[in-house]
Regions:
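Short glycine/serine/threonine/alanine-rich loop segments
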Residues: 76, 130, 295, 343, ...
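Ligand-binding pocket scaffold of soluble enzyme catalytic domains
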Residues: 50, 341-344, 384
């Protein structure tokens, strides 16, 4: 019997408010794009799950083709069976022989599988009438463990060790949920320090971030060392010693250049240096981290799979792990790996829809995995939220726990129509 669901894919593009908002030292392409997937439950009118693959600029047509190929793997499955065992569904998506040779554990096909599983998670949470963070945090520990594929992780973390991590924090889950609902989750302001902002704008945005309750900000760096030192001096003078200042190099440097550049900036008491070099150079990250100690290195948004996260942690290459709005199952694996080594997780959220999704993962981590918000923050960029049905809410420098069912990935129908490529009405001149 055929599966009782249908699906639709769309390429979505947004122009940044300024052509340089969100641009980094390695790329001045700040436009956001997404390959967007909607899975509809044909048995229940209006029941939909939404997932996407985020990117900058174009190339969505290639990613959409990958999503179509992955959807073909499950087109003959019943929706109920897919949702009943999300661990097995994930393994089906990533292990199928049709795509096993296409960059296993990474690449376009793997990213596409992430969009598919996330759309299913969105639908599962909506069926349960729960926000995703609460659905995950309410699962028994053994069920959470079954969501993770430990084949390539067990040399660092076994299923039994993962279960022990979850069981250790289980007794106070309800207490932590009450605290989350009352206080929210720390947010880090990424908007003040865009690389191409004037000194005057940098100063003003730093003051506004502090007035809004943020205790951490981020500056982009890496284009010019003299400029970076001047901008950091301004930010530190404005913010004082009690505001954490992180910097993001956007993969700009080679290893030796990174060590020299970071050393030249270290006097400004850097909270971390993000993405200093190629995301696939794990040994390079380790070399940088060891050379610039005690300045922490943060990375992970470009990690192709939890296997890379495992290796970064084994190499002591990072002081902070940054996850992104990628496959829920793999993010759970990464959260468990980080908890097992005591490394804080600070999700990246610098694009359309990322805040809406990663907040659920961070809140699940606090309640059910690490049990801590200490030294943690979710990145916040004040752009694109108006395009989503349940936009992320940040007040007094903290994310407020979303209470609407789902993962937060669902876009407004009007925004989907206005920003669909190539039929755009609100985005002119972007190719």
């Amino acid at each position: 019997m055929g599966a009782a669901f249908s699906y639709l894919t769309s390429e979505i593009r947004f122009a940044s408010p300024s052509r340089l908002d969100g641009a980094g030292a390695a790329s001045r392409d700040a436009d956001c794009a997404a390959a967007y997937l909607t899975i509809s439950d044909d048995a229940i009118d209006g029941a939909e799950g939404h997932g996407f693959v985020f990117s900058a600029g174009g190339s969505g047509d290639v990613q959409l083709a990958a999503i179509e190929a992955v959807m073909a793997i499950i087109e003959d499955r019943r929706l109920d069976s897919l949702l009943a065992d999300m661990g097995e569904t994930w393994r089906t998506l990533v292990d199928h022989t049709r795509r096993g040779w296409l960059a296993p554990d990474g690449g376009l096909a793997h990213r596409a599988a992430g969009a598919v599983i996330n759309a299913l998670w969105d639908l599962k949470a909506k069926r349960a009438g729960l926000p995703l963070w609460r659905l995950l945090a309410g699962m028994p520990s053994a069920e959470i463990v079954r969501l993770v594929d430990f084949r390539y992780l067990s040399d660092a973390l076994s299923a039994e060790e993962a279960l022990a991590i979850l069981e250790a924090v289980l007794p106070h889950r309800a207490q932590r949920e009450r605290r989350l609902l009352a206080e929210g989750y720390p947010a880090a302001a990424a908007s003040p320090g865009e690389l191409w902002y004037s000194d005057e704008l940098l100063e003003r945005l730093c003051r506004e971030a502090m007035a809004d309750g943020f205790t951490q900000i981020k500056l982009k760096v890496g284009a010019n060392l003299v400029d970076d030192r001047r901008r950091l001096a301004i930010a530190r003078e404005v913010c004082g010693p009690d505001i954490a200042i992180a910097v993001d190099a956007d993969r700009r440097w080679g290893v030796d250049e990174a060590v020299g550049w970071i050393s030249a900036l270290s006097e400004f008491d850097l909270h971390w240096v993000e993405d200093p070099t190629s995301p696939v150079d794990l040994l390079g990250h380790a070399a940088i981290a060891h050379a610039v100690t005690p300045v922490p290195i943060a990375t992970g948004e470009h990690a192709l799979s939890p296997v890379m996260v495992k290796q970064l942690l084994q190499l002591n290459a990072i002081g902070y792990l940054q996850i992104d709005a990628t496959a829920v199952n793999e993010n759970i694996a990464s959260l468990l790996l980080a908890a097992g080594t005591g490394v804080p997780v600070c999700p990246r959220a610098g694009g359309a829809g990322l805040s809406e999704v990663v907040q659920h993962l961070a809140m699940f981590d606090y309640i059910a995995v690490s049990g801590s918000m200490e030294g943690r923050a979710i990145e916040h960029v004040d752009r694109y939220h108006e395009h989503f049905v349940t936009p992320a809410e940040v007040r007094d420098g903290r994310y407020r726990a979303p209470l609407f069912p789902g993962s937060g990935a669902e876009m407004l129908p009007t925004s989907l129509g206005d920003h669909m490529w190539p039929m755009l009405s609100a985005l002119d001149g972007v190719a």
